[in-house]
Amino acid sequence: MDLKVFDGQEKSELSMIEVAHAILAYHNEAMAFADLTNEIQQYLGKSDEEIRERLSQFYTDLNVDGSFISLGDNTWGLRAWYPYESIDEATVGETEDEEDRPKKRRRKVNAFLAGTDDDDDVIDYDNDDPEDEDLDDDQGPDDDDDYEEDDYDEDNPVEDDDEETNIEDQLSELHGDEFGDDEEEDEEDKEDDEE
């Protein structure tokens, strides 16, 4: 294939995007990505390994470059071929058959209607948790959780008439000679006071 656009230029200096644009313009029709890549490889004379290394960058460049358009199914064309208004139609594809078929209307269901003929659609909120039934069955005459006088612990009675201790009493207990050095300080304080 001879692309006249690149006459006088070395093929090693050309980017894959430039060659892709020229190939699509030469064929004047959209091409599959694999076919486009194969033609680029043939034109540039690159090995399979060199193309594989640059393939992901080439695909990214196709997506980013504004002169290319994806037509679905990994088919690519030039954006200049499609007027602005027809881009959506070209990329969406043929869906006329689906639009002609009448759509099924969905029936609205009201879960709070009582006395309807179709009881399958009505939700019974009183009986919605099977675990509740299991708990009710487990309850027996011995499973009563209420407090009874038998639960009173005679070995450890709780007395209400304990000596009331206030915060001052507790602090004075803590303020005592915990470290054994308070007596020396107290004597020094007395000597200072006498002088």
Swiss-Prot record:
This chain's protein is named: Probable DNA-directed RNA polymerase subunit delta
Instruction: Please provide the record's keywords in A-Z order.
Output: DNA-directed RNA polymerase, Nucleotidyltransferase, Transcription, Transferase
What does the record give under GO molecular function? DNA-directed RNA polymerase activity
What's the encoding gene here?
A: rpoE
Q: Where is this region: Disordered?
A: 91-195
- Residue intervals of the HTH HARE-type domain: 14-81
The cross-references to HAMAP family, in alphabetical order and at most eight, read: RNApol_bact_RpoE
Role, per record: Participates in both the initiation and recycling phases of transcription. In the presence of the delta subunit, RNAP displays an increased specificity of transcription, a decreased affinity for nucleic acids, and an increased efficiency of RNA synthesis because of enhanced recycling.
> How is this protein annotated for GO cellular component?
DNA-directed RNA polymerase complex
Q: How does it assemble?
A: RNAP is composed of a core of 2 alpha, a beta and a beta' subunits. The core is associated with a delta subunit and one of several sigma factors.
Instruction: Specify the domain of life of the species encoding this protein.
Output: Bacteria
**Source organism:** Limosilactobacillus fermentum (strain NBRC 3956 / LMG 18251)
What GO biological process terms does the UniProt entry carry, in alphabetical order? DNA-templated transcription; regulation of DNA-templated transcription
Residue ranges, compositional bias (Acidic residues):
116-171, 179-195
Q: What protein family does this chain belong to?
A: Belongs to the RpoE family.
